[in-house]
Regions:
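Basic nucleic-acid-binding interfaces
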Residues: 1-131
Length: 131
């Protein structure tokens, strides 16, 4: 779902980000039914918040996401919403993860983020698709 420009009551904007994050200890656990459920949860979260996801790739040990959202929230707030919501549900639905992950989080603390301009967008989309 791509949007060229979004409009607010007094704003017009187009802000896209390439975000990457990993499970705790970079464990290779994001596959099969867990990866499918994770994708569903991310899509739901993005839809509920009225953001737009242009591309996603879930690898065994990391996630790539190309996302557009309103600039009224910070990048760190957006990442916290995605990671926090998915962590809780995935840990509840896949209790066998306790064997690999200690503590109360599925995700490592940090993340990578870069802004994506119009010129770079197709390059980033192809990169994510080819992961």
């Amino acid at each position: 779902m791509e949007k060229k420009y979004w409009s607010g009551s007094q704003t017009k904007h187009r802000v896209k980000y390439h975000i990457v994050w990993t499970p705790k200890y970079r464990k290779r656990i994001l596959d099969g039914k867990l990866a499918e459920r994770l994708k569903e949860l991310l899509e739901e979260c993005i839809e509920v918040n009225r953001w737009a996801m242009d591309e996603i790739s879930i690898q065994k040990d990391h996630i790539h996401l190309l996302i557009q959202f309103v600039p009224s929230i910070s990048i760190s707030e957006m990442v916290q919403i995605l990671k926090g919501g998915t962590s809780r549900v995935i840990r509840e639905e896949f209790p066998e993860l306790k064997e690999f992950l200690w503590g109360s989080s599925l995700w490592a603390d940090g993340y990578f983020v870069e802004s994506v301009g119009s010129f770079e967008e197709n390059i980033i989309q192809k990169y994510i698709q080819n992961q």
